[in-house]
Each structure stands twice: as structure tokens, then as C-alpha cells.
């Protein structure tokens, strides 16, 4: 499981949620899934000029005839347009495509350095502008680390710098615990369309752990671990108590044993006719 590139699949309902939220009859599943794909494709096609500013498109359905589309972006003004012109055009376009009422909402990303998709989009955009990939990756990594991200890993693959043979280049800072399911790891992927071909950009961001290691579910408080001194005192105390209990039990056992032994000796002497 540690070889999984995309960390979301193992963390659904742990610290990640579905990007399409709806539940309908299984007969309608394929149709609605195709509509979701169509909504995302047409939205990105319409916003092609600012596609690098789009982080995520979330789809929520409460009934068959109403669809809510939430677009996450660090620049909501460029998506909304002048007096909401872009939103109105996108709504009309999607309504014609799927024949359902579309409600579009904008979600602002206040910290772009904490969003892996935005970081990947920024790198891809600068690669298309012929920026040096080595300096670009290092500057993006340092920018995220300086903002408080605990771990960053960036990987680019393709004909880097116009080389004839495709290869990969990777930079990493901090830790990326892919095996730890409580770790909040964000992932983003983008493609840079260069004159030499397509360059893929992958970004992993570790933003801390969302679930504690030891928690008390009843009280909702963190359980403090005992120090080694407290542990030794605790075990010494229990060991003394156990010994004292053992001694008491041994005394009772020995007393019973003596009584049983005296009775058995007296009965043996009576049988043999000797005096007690």
C-alpha cells in the first residue's frame, strides 16, 4: 500500500471526503457519473485561460434536477468575472449539456501554499514559460516550507530542459508519511504543455496529523503518558502488594497444611494403637 501515488484513496472518510457527494439508485449511477465527468470537463474547458487557478471542482446533488458545483480557487475574482458574467455563462453552458438546474458557488483558498494542486499548477505554468526547472522546484519547495508545511515532495517527469531522453527530477524537504493514515497529505498533479512535449508535475504536501495517537473517546481529552519514574514506582508498589498478598495466602495455606498434617498423624497413630 505504500506504493500508492495518490494518497486520497486510503484516506477517504479518515481525513478526506468524496469530490462527488450524492446517492441514487444503482440504475442511475452510470448516467450521473457521466454527468459529473461532463461538468468538470466543460468547466475546465471554459476556464482554460485561468485553468492554473482552479484547485478543485466539487459536485453535490440533493435530487436529480438540482446540481451544486463548488469551484475552489485562490483568485475568485478571475473565475467570477465582471459582475458574475463567467458564472452565468458556465451555468447556461452546463444547463444545455445536462438539462438540469445548475447552482455554481466559489470557494476561496486563502493559503495557496497549503494546496498541492495550486502548487503543481504554478510549477506547470512557469515550465510552459521556459523557466529553469531546478530553480523553480527549489523555490516552490522553500515557499511552502516557510509557510508552515511540515513536508514537501515535488517530482517532474518528461523532456526536462529539452533533453532528447525523458527523465525525472525530484526534490524533497521534511517528511511525507504515506503509511500513516492519520497524516493529512495533500496531492496535486498538473501537466505543462511545452514545445518539447508534455511534462508531468506531481506534488505531495504533509500538513500534520489530524488524529491523535492516544485519545480518550469518553472524555475527549488526550491521555498523558507516564514517565519512566512513575512507571517504576507503580510496578514496585504493585509488586509489594502482590508479595504481601502472596505471603498471606501462603500463611493460610501453610496453616491449613499443618492442621491437615496433625489430623492425619493422629489418625495414623490411633490405627496403629499408639498413644497420641
From Swiss-Prot:
Function: Binds the lower part of the 30S subunit head. Binds mRNA in the 70S ribosome, positioning it for translation.
Keyword set includes Metal-binding: no
Gene3D superfamilies referenced in this protein's UniProt entry, alphabetically: 3.30.300.20, Ribosomal protein S3, C-terminal domain (3.30.1140.32)
Domain named KH type-2: residues: 39-110
CDD domains: KH-II_30S_S3
Keywords: Ribonucleoprotein, Ribosomal protein, RNA-binding, rRNA-binding
Family: Belongs to the universal ribosomal protein uS3 family.
Protein name: Small ribosomal subunit protein uS3
The protein's assembly and partners: Part of the 30S ribosomal subunit. Forms a tight complex with proteins S10 and S14.
GO biological process, one term: translation
Phylogenetic classification of the source organism: Bacteria, Pseudomonadati, Spirochaetota, Spirochaetia, Spirochaetales
A cellular component annotation (GO) from this entry: cytosolic small ribosomal subunit
Matches recorded under NCBIfam families: rpsC_bact (TIGR01009)
A Pfam family it matches: KH_2
GO MF term set: mRNA binding; rRNA binding; structural constituent of ribosome
